UniProtKB/Swiss-Prot annotation:
Protein name per UniProt: GATA zinc finger domain-containing protein 1
Region feature (Disordered): 67-120
PANTHER family attached to this UniProt entry: GATA ZINC FINGER DOMAIN-CONTAINING (PTHR13340), GATA ZINC FINGER DOMAIN-CONTAINING PROTEIN 1 (PTHR13340:SF2)
GO MF term list: sequence-specific DNA binding; zinc ion binding
Amino acid sequence: MPLGLKPTCSVCKTTSSSMWKKGPQGEILCHHCTGRGGAGGGGSCPGAAGGTGGGGGGTGGGFGAATFASTSAAPPQSNGGGGGKQSKQEIHRRSARLRNTKYKSAPAAEKKVSTKGKGRRHIFKLKNPIKAPESVSTIITAESIFYKGVYYQIGDVVSVIDEQDGKPYYAQIRGFVQDQYCEKSAALTWLIPTLASPRDQFDPASYIVGPEEDLPRKMEYLEFVCHAPSEYFKSRSSPFPTVPTRPEKGYIWTHVGPTPAITIKETVANHL
């Protein structure tokens, strides 16, 4: 039997039985009283059976009469007010048990949905594995870059140290290249020294333009020397006031502060 209040037979008032059944009027009957009602005649057959089993003895007849009286008196009691109240109480108890049973069966429904016995390998095998796309090299060219705190522009002079003799060799930057991994490189144009070139420093006036390299070099092997010289390396703009042949716009260099920039007319007048 489920946990809770124990049922009581409406006929014999017993609380223990191997089987409980419900009568036609809603009363609860034990297994013994259910067998009596099914024998026929409101319990007349159990009395007759008791008399027959007793034979000629008076004891058997007395037991049968007592049994008949108890069974015949039981139905009117069940039809009365007290029996009706108890039957309603039992119906209420039964409905409460049914609600508890439904409440307890809810986790069982969740177990059906749960993936029992399926581990992480099953989750990862739901879809077929797909190879990652191959990386495509993307090159971005630029006219200026910022590398290790130094602002490089096209035309700047850099030095490269040779691994064999350890001497510096100078070159001019022709362009900048950046790949998909943000690795920066520069295309160089070598500067050839002359007999008048000093050994300890770089003098732009004593160098001539040499061959151009086809492959760019990484910026980590280059060391900044100076920005683009004004006249010798054919810079389109100059930091110094010169006599221009035609009006020029878009200078890289500018004045810092309230001092106005030198105009072309003032420059020409000073030189004259």
